[in-house]
Amino acid sequence: MPERLAETLMDLWTPLIILWITLPSCVYTAPMNQAHVLTTGSPLELSRQSEDMRILSRSKRGWVWNQMFVLEEFSGPEPILVGRLHTDLDPGSKKIKYILSGDGAGTIFQINDITGDIHAIKRLDREEKAEYTLTAQAVDFETNKPLEPPSEFIIKVQDINDNAPEFLNGPYHATVPEMSILGTSVTNVTATDADDPVYGNSAKLVYSILEGQPYFSIEPETAIIKTALPNMDREAKEEYLVVIQAKDMGGHSGGLSGTTTLTVTLTDVNDNPPKFAQSLYHFSVPEDVVLGTAIGRVKANDQDIGENAQSSYDIIDGDGTALFEITSDAQAQDGVIRLRKPLDFETKKSYTLKVEAANIHIDPRFSSRGPFKDTATVKIVVEDADEPPVFSSPTYLLEVHENAALNSVIGQVTARDPDITSSPIRFSIDRHTDLERQFNINADDGKITLATPLDRELSVWHNITIIATEIRNHSQISRVPVAIKVLDVNDNAPEFASEYEAFLCENGKPGQVIQTVSAMDKDDPKNGHFFLYSLLPEMVNNPNFTIKKNEDNSLSILAKHNGFNRQKQEVYLLPIVISDSGNPPLSSTSTLTIRVCGCSNDGVVQSCNVEAYVLPIGLSMGALIAILACIILLLVIVVLFVTLRRHKNEPLIIKDDEDVRENIIRYDDEGGGEEDTEAFDIATLQNPDGINGFLPRKDIKPDLQFMPRQGLAPVPNGVDVDEFINVRLHEADNDPTAPPYDSIQIYGYEGRGSVAGSLSSLESTTSDSDQNFDYLSDWGPRFKRLGELYSVGESDKET
């Protein structure tokens, strides 16, 4: 490195020395009167110099200097002398002092204030700053007063070759298609040099390839890289590394250089055809494989990549073109052979296919290399499998008359085992499709028979499923749908299509159509319905009505005369015989009711029956019934509301201390120790059911044959309890169907420990007047009150 720097300095100083000899007037210490020989500087500097010349020539004073230069990167033991300042006002008496200011004054440049010598005290770098602008001024040494106006000058840093070229964007990557012709442009690179491009050759660059030949070349000045060999093959080598050098000084010796790398990748083109790895492929497949299943894969290799390697696969020949197909798998770049139709080992055991692989994207530039396709042979062997039974037909359609006899054969299904072993077949009906079990099937021969009667009018079609099962392998089953159509037979007689009721006006005219009726038949003859209408033989000579057949298969009833009188006869019944056209024909008799009504002159019914009244206002019988029901419901609600108000205002029983609530007899202190504690409920005696004529009882009644009972008269509200009980007792005494009990009450403990025992022994078949209760007084004071109740005094009898 020091040797190279010395050579560079020598190259620079040589022209400077020559310039020093030939141009003595350009020395930077020249006096002011010789400054006119300057040839450098800006127009402003030249103008200012001319102006100074005019001033100095007039006053004989002024600055003397040149534009100064200093060499960059100079490093010596002493500060380098840049130049000297001098004015003609300086007689050499050292009374003038020079002052320097501006860029780098005092830090980079120093001035001797007495002599005016300027030195550079630091190493300069032109790439950092190329020139410095300074200001010089001469002042009186003692007073520091300016002797001349200040003036600017420039110190330029002279360049040396101290910067090597650099590739700022490296390393580089580029692509070029394979098989390119010679001289195909790949890319271009650019290097920069920080040295001065104007001064010398320090920044003049020359490019060259250090590594990458003989495949690539580079233009020395433009740095354009091109292919140096034709038809480079990506399949042989895909990537190349090129080392590029940029050298300054025009590439001469002593110049600085920089390098970078360029990676060149060859892109693929379709220059290779597909090629099968083998010419013959073998595959095997069971005969019961599902359609669409992949049987095998074939692949044609292609040295190209991407879309250039894509191939389409086709079956171009063979005896299985109808059974197999091949599809292209773009991901795996192979062909998938799939089953297209069912196979049968018993029919054919092997197949041969010829498949072809062809490139999809063809480059016409390489068509001379031959067809971009290849073929291979595929052998497919069918393997035997235990197959399910096969029916002779995929569906069956059977017909049966609805009057077919039970156990008669409707039809037959057949199935076989396609295997070589040929297992026997057993048939059955899927009962989920025949829930009513209307059909049976012979398990051996598949004959379908009728199990229950059929009715076409209920169901025309029956869809069942027949199952065929191999006897040797019950897992092998097949199903087939069977549609059974029920054929019609004439088993239904025709009848009126609806309920007809005709109305005849008293003032009707002879021949007037009273009613038009139509018939219906549940049967379905092939040629359609055709009905015959007639009157009963005894009604053929009917003096009042006649019938007329219409073309639309309907019947009109006509009046033979006028002058009908509904007072004499209000209703006429006309039996009509309806016959169908079946074989044999069936007939039925339907009766038409004809009512005689009073009508207006224009034929409007005015008085006949309920329906005749509602017809003019447009109301049907259903609407009338609905209106009446609403009215009745409203009346019931009103009655219930009034009844509830009366019960609320006038209660039946006054709940006070005098009310008899516990027993019929009120025992004060006398009954403190009695044992009959069964409560007496007055509400039971006032049971509404009893009022309506039915008396429910809690006692167990004897098993007797009862006679109808008379209804009980209702009891008015607000009556005395004593009178109420007497009325009930009288009713019970006169009731022949009543069981032998005194009352409807249950006395669980009454009479226990008493001399008389229970009151149930008392006879109640007679009235109070026929009974003698005097013996009750002998029972003691405990029954005194009871004896008074059942005894009849003279006052009572008189009453």
UniProtKB/Swiss-Prot annotation:
Residues 30-61 form a propeptide. Keywords: Calcium, Cell adhesion, Cell membrane, Cleavage on pair of basic residues, Glycoprotein, Membrane, Metal-binding, Phosphoprotein, Repeat, Signal, Transmembrane, Transmembrane helix. GO terms for molecular function: calcium ion binding; identical protein binding. Glycans are attached at N188, N463, N473, N544. The chain crosses the membrane at residues 622-642. SMART domains: CA. It comes from Mus musculus (Mouse). GO terms for cellular component: axon terminus; glutamatergic synapse; plasma membrane; synaptic cleft; synaptic membrane. It is a single-pass type I membrane protein. Residues 1-29 form the signal peptide. The gene is Cdh8. InterPro entries: Cadherin (IPR039808), Cadherin-like_dom (IPR002126), Cadherin-like_sf (IPR015919), Cadherin_CS (IPR020894), Cadherin_Y-type_LIR (IPR000233), Catenin-bd_sf (IPR027397). Residues 62-621 are extracellular. It holds the Pfam family Cadherin. This is Cadherin-8.
